[in-house]
Amino acid sequence: MRKRQAKKRPLLPDPKFNDQLVTRFVNMMMWDGKKSVAFKIFYDAIAIVDEKKQDEEKTGLEIWKDALSNVMPHVEVRSRRVGGATFQIPMQIRPDRKVSTAMKWLISFSRKRNEKSMAGKLAAEVLAAAKEEGAAVKKRVDTHKMAEANKAFSHFRF
């Protein structure tokens, strides 16, 4: 194990929107170190969101941020062994973990969609999540239901 926790390295903001959150998302979406490909997919997806949006006063990036906040879980369950039995204990999530979990879900459920390109898949999932629907939002709802169902075990906190 480490002697001390590793320092968080600062992320460079992305070139188009000058936003660190976008860079974090692109880094998670990137495969095989192909960052330029991941950036192209993200920017194309935001352009598609801009075309298909119903809300005229919001930009594609704002819709993406709304979608991200709609997917963010507030509680999660963690396994803990107590006297031979394993309990699912509901726990609050740290703010940085909320964001990274939401990003992971948005990316993974985008990849499972049936659109032609990854940009199309991501755009469709972002638009769905912004409207409080889609697989990523369903995952958040299921996680919250699981935490609610196991509320009785919350006194076993870590």
Swiss-Prot record:
GO terms for cellular component: small ribosomal subunit. The keyword tRNA-binding applies. GO terms for molecular function: rRNA binding; structural constituent of ribosome; tRNA binding. InterPro entries: Ribosomal_uS7, Ribosomal_uS7_bac/org-type, Ribosomal_uS7_CS, Ribosomal_uS7_dom, Ribosomal_uS7_dom_sf. Keywords: Ribonucleoprotein, Ribosomal protein, RNA-binding, rRNA-binding, tRNA-binding. GO terms for biological process: translation. One of the primary rRNA binding proteins, it binds directly to 16S rRNA where it nucleates assembly of the head domain of the 30S subunit. Is located at the subunit interface close to the decoding center, probably blocks exit of the E-site tRNA. Belongs to the universal ribosomal protein uS7 family. Part of the 30S ribosomal subunit. Contacts proteins S9 and S11. This is Small ribosomal subunit protein uS7. It comes from Christiangramia forsetii (strain DSM 17595 / CGMCC 1.15422 / KT0803) (Gramella forsetii).
